[in-house]
Amino acid sequence: MRINPTTSGSEVSAVEKKNLGRIVKIIGPVLDVAFPPGKMPNIYNALVVQGRDNEQTNVTCEVQQLLGNNRVRAVAMSDTDGLMRGMEVIDTGAPISVPVGGSTLGRIFNVLGQPVDNLGPVDTNTTSPIHRSAPAFIQLDTKLSIFETGIKVVDLLAPYRRGGKIGLFGGAGVGKTVLIMELINNIAKAHGGVSVFGGVGERTREGNDLYLEMKESGVINEENIPESKVALVYGQMNEPPGARMRVGLTALTMAEYFRDVNEQDVLLFIDNIFRFVQAGSEVSALLGRMPSAVGYQPTLSTEMGSLQERITSTKEGSITSIQAVYVPADDLTDPAPATTFAHLDATTVLSRGLAAKGIYPAVDPLDSTSTMLQPRIVGEEHYETAQRVKQTLQRYKELQDIIAILGLDELSEEDRLTVARARKIERFLSQPFFVAEVFTGSPGKYVGLAETIRGFQLILSGELDGLPEQAFYLVGNIDEATAKAMNLKT
């Protein structure tokens, strides 16, 4: 841990100021800097550009290449407007360091760990470098355990692994943000954990909307900021590629502190992991590297691995990561999503069709997958229930064309029963969310895994065949559904 050298020029010590270089070349966000012989900065060191007459420019760069002839090539983390050849550059002697700890909760940061929410400086002296190696093999927690979210459809059909990585696939307006906020809320209540949200190359408007919705739903506590459950780190679309490439590491560094020092379970959201790859591709081209397949950087899998391997469970705590994945032109074989898939333990697919029916969360029960759904991990009872639910829904899907053309009456007795149960299951997979209370007026529900399994077993067994299907819509456990059915009858 060290005092952050990148937040202001005054914090660069007198000793560090001795290692001065000068800008010799500027190409967009890439700078070439000459240093005195024998005083070359290390790869990944942060460099701060001094303005004319000691004016602060606040442009921080990161060393990427040592070129020879006492020159380094660095990538800027902010706009290089106004920089000129001959300007002094200070080698801070360390990588970019960002604030970590409880005081980061409820705040918004940029890639350098500077707060951008107009709420004043962050009350902490503890900082951590954004570049570090993944935990050693001996530190890892190799036990396979389920990360219970309290969301029925996720826990039953595509359970998350503690310390795992989940890909979240969904277009605009299908409830991705609400699902993210509910997970942030539930991890705080059920696991006493915190969340870090990394907005990587996303629209400024979306980041602003998410912040306002989090304040409205109580995930960020405006009255008492330290009581908030999430820290936000943004590197928006309009920022240089260096910032977008490193903002994921800034968010991960904050999450690692909660895991390693506070020994908490942490939820890390990255939206969007594709933008991380895209920014790396831009930087790679600017550094003059030969492009690889489809124009991506030759170091694609190395860069992805260095980020993903740090997201893991140790004996102290866990980082469970949920990553939104954009698939360019819906081509799953594109190198960017294909490299991401290699690291994912589960996929949660949001369906526009379910959202149109009003079934929220609109998680597609047949498209969502998880490596954890195995009898030896989740147990026979859970596995059997999940498989029977999927079989029932799959049969219903197959019958929908016949129903649309001929109607329900033309089906066999057995198929009619399957359709009736599938419609109950479909509705029972919906659930009222805590963070949506402000919009829906119905109180949120956290449903434990055992309760979820019991509910679906009762529907599959036929014990609840006599209840109307609307009784299963937007309820928590199965007892609420039976109580709702009694109310509907009266």
From Swiss-Prot:
Membrane protein topology class: Peripheral membrane protein
Family annotation (Pfam families): ATP-synt_ab, ATP-synt_ab_N, ATP-synt_VA_C
Highest taxon of the lineage: Eukaryota
One Gene Ontology CC term in the entry: chloroplast thylakoid membrane
GO MF: ATP binding; ATP hydrolysis activity; proton-transporting ATP synthase activity, rotational mechanism
Location (main, coarse): plastid
Function summary: Produces ATP from ADP in the presence of a proton gradient across the membrane. The catalytic sites are hosted primarily by the beta subunits.
Subunit structure: F-type ATPases have 2 components, CF(1) - the catalytic core - and CF(0) - the membrane proton channel. CF(1) has five subunits: alpha(3), beta(3), gamma(1), delta(1), epsilon(1). CF(0) has four main subunits: a(1), b(1), b'(1) and c(9-12).
GO biological-process terms attached to the record: proton motive force-driven mitochondrial ATP synthesis
NCBIfam families: atpD
Keywords, in A-Z order: ATP synthesis, ATP-binding, CF(1), Chloroplast, Hydrogen ion transport, Ion transport, Membrane, Nucleotide-binding, Plastid, Thylakoid, Translocase, Transport
EC number: 7.1.2.2
Broad class of enzyme this protein falls into: translocase
Protein name: ATP synthase subunit beta, chloroplastic
